[in-house]
Amino acid sequence: MNKKDRNETKDEELYETLIHDSVKEFEDVHPYNEKEQKRIIQRGKNSAIRTNILISLAVLLLIVPVMTLSTYLYYAIGGRANNLIEVASKTVYVTEPNMSLEEMELEEDIGFFSMNITYDVFKRIGQEDYKVGNYEIYHAFDKPSLPKRNMSLERPLPELPSEETEYLVHPDAAIPLERSDEWDILRGLPDGTVSEVYVSLNQLMGPEELEKQFGKNIEVRWLAVDTGVEAHHVDGEGLYVTQLGYPAQIDDTTWSPFNGRDQNNEEVFMDILQFLEKNEEVTVKFARGKSLVLSERISYLKENGIHVYGAVVTGPTPELRKLENSPFVRSIKVGEVKLWNWK
């Protein structure tokens, strides 16, 4: 073998050695076969998925308390929640005849930047207060939806009032045609009952003057106040204007704004109107009529004083029948009736 051949043989051996060493090195670095490598890759993928899930759950678990805390802070700062509750409750007192609330019957449920207010409403019929339903109002941030009224009344107020369905009629407004049947309804009730009656007057009267017109066996519960718009009950845009009034009697519960401690009911009524004027956009949502024009009506009351055109009264049914012969009564609307509870 010549020298050239020997060199070529050495080169081949060296090349084979390098190949063998490279294969051995690769096998040392990658000791797993293809199946095992796929299993390892899949295990890595599963581990990554689990890690992502755990991270997502951790973020969600962190978001929930942060959102909850932020919501409570939102409603707490500036007294937003209390203000919304106060607007809702005071709207009932001055727009819903013979309707009242009780503090312990009001609930608030706060969600993510939302609040749901639920409160029971009561009527005095005879000498007892009866629960007659509940109102539920959902708020997204501080924007309320229309109230959901769940009432258990025989003769509930209309959801969308109009001149034809108004229970208390101004002396300058036309009396609805069906109103003549109300005296027949009252006469047809058993003597052993107490009733609620909406009385419309022939003329405007002062609150004290009106109360003197009723005997001791009839209790005046709510006074409908003339604010300059009740003759037509529509505003400049043709929207029905909500009636306004206030409780005639002192409510000695601490919850009621008409508790008689610092102001008489007329003064409280005026204060409430001015408070609601500052929150009129929200108040309109709560009221049945979709217009309030509070600024105009407050100015009218300041200039002309408080005069009433109607009242809600309650008492023994036989006593209420006597109102038919009263010269100051223009028309009536019979409300709720209960079994005898007059003492």
Feature roles, as predicted:
Residues 75-91:
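Ser/Thr/Pro/Gly-rich low-complexity linker/stalk segments immediately outside membranes or between
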